[in-house]
């Protein structure tokens, strides 16, 4: 109905749709139908409108489910929403958001990236509201540097070359970590 309903809980399918859009930049959903048959999950029969989003995100390893099912109609808690968002930025390439204690690792990573400002840990364990997910997505788009993982160096920022200046034969280069918002939508930090 085109309304936001900020206090309403958000489902796993809805978060997958949002993560797809911020990760690909396909905000008009021009290509999402191409991914409807890419699903690895057994419970997609009732996913309807969300099949393409879930298919893309599953194959890009932005969502994981339980290995067999995704449970698209279930609501997400804050930890689950954060895990999906952090995967879009580049985290969990070393599977640190899986297994025992994954919630602590998700919260710790989000805290280091300042995504949890004014959001308490108790808020993360309950159903995530649309408002909370919107705030977390905004912070991830604008402030969290995208990363790549290598076994030798761990997580390293994806670097964009900016402000290349040649003055008096001297080359000055500023390297800035690139956020998902910069990469996908050309957003700039002020």
Pin down the residues of each PLM region.
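Feature responds to low-complexity, polar/acidic, surface-exposed segments characteristic
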Residues: 1-16, 20-51, 59-79, 86-127, ...
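RNA/tRNA-interacting regions in translation and RNA-turnover enzymes
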Residues: 131
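Conserved redox-cofactor binding core of oxidoreductases
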Residues: 138
């Amino acid at each position: 109905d085109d309304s936001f309903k900020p206090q309403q809980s958000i489902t796993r399918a809805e978060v997958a749709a949002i993560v797809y859009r911020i990760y690909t930049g396909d905000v008009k959903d021009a290509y999402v139908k191409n991914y409807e048959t890419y699903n690895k999950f057994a419970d997609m029969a009732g996913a309807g409108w969300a099949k393409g989003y879930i298919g893309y995100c599953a194959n890009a390893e932005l969502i994981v489910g339980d290995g067999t099912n995704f449970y698209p109609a279930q609501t997400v808690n804050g930890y689950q929403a954060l895990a999906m968002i952090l995967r879009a930025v580049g985290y969990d390439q070393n599977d640190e958001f899986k297994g025992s204690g994954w919630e602590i690792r998700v919260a710790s990573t989000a805290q280091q990236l300042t995504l949890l400002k004014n959001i308490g840990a108790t808020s993360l364990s309950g159903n995530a509201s649309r408002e909370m997910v919107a705030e977390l997505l905004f912070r991830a788009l604008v402030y969290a540097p995208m990363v790549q993982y290598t076994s030798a160096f761990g997580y390293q920022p994806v670097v964009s070359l900016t402000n290349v200046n040649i003055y008096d034969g001297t080359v000055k280069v500023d390297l800035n970590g690139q956020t998902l918002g910069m990469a996908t939508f050309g957003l700039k930090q002020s």
